Amino acid sequence: GEDALAEARQRYQLPKRYLLNVGTVEVRKNILLGIEALPFLPQDMHLVVVGRKTSYQKKLNSAIQSLGIGDRVHFIQGIPNNLLPAIYRQAEAFIYPSRYDGFGIPIIEAIQSGLPVVAAKGSCLEEAGGPDSLYVDADDAKGLAEAVEKAMQNRTEMVEKSRQYVKRFENQNVAEQIISCYERI
């Protein structure tokens, strides 16, 4: 409840407004795109990335430095499961610009937490996010920023429709759906 929200905000020094990404920080997750999109967004919008770091972190750090947005990007790892929902719930939107991903389980979690989702086109992510999430080219930072702006304007409607859509994963075997998605690729 409210306690978890406050605890998460304090413990992880969460910014007032942030976009969220959850997953291992590795090349194919393409978090670089989220970093490159930040300069196109309002100054008070931050990016919070939750996940285990890999060597890809070096590349991200140099991009953050050259864009001069070090104070706007926050990497957090080792979050206990009981606080993760609080981090989802306080975000403005969920971004998932991954190039090759499985089914995008974090997308479903984000929608269930009441977040609008912006993901990359052309993988199984569209299957997870449904028709009311927004999808952008995996190399288009400005496009990602524009989609985030749009998601925030249409937030209530996007979230309501997407929540309806992801209900199908609650009562069906998600594994079956993932397999059927892969078979089409």
Question: Model segments located where?
Answer:
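C-terminal alpha-helical cap of glycosyltransferases
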Residues: 171-185
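Nucleotide-activated donor-binding/catalytic signature segment of Leloir-type glycosyltransferases, i.e.
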Residues: 60-82
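A short, well-ordered alpha-helix in the C-terminal region of glycosyltransferases
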Residues: 156-169, 179
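A conserved mid-protein helix/loop that constitutes part of the nucleotide-sugar donor-binding site
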Residues: 24-40, 58-61
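Aromatic "clamp/platform" in nucleotide-sugar-dependent glycosyltransferases that forms part
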Residues: 99
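Short hydrophobic beta-strand element within catalytic cores of glycosyltransferases
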Residues: 107, 111-112, 116-119
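Short alpha-helical donor nucleotide-sugar binding micro-motif in glycosyltransferases
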Residues: 86-91, 96
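Conserved acidic donor-binding segment of nucleotide-sugar-dependent glycosyltransferases
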Residues: 134-141, 150-155
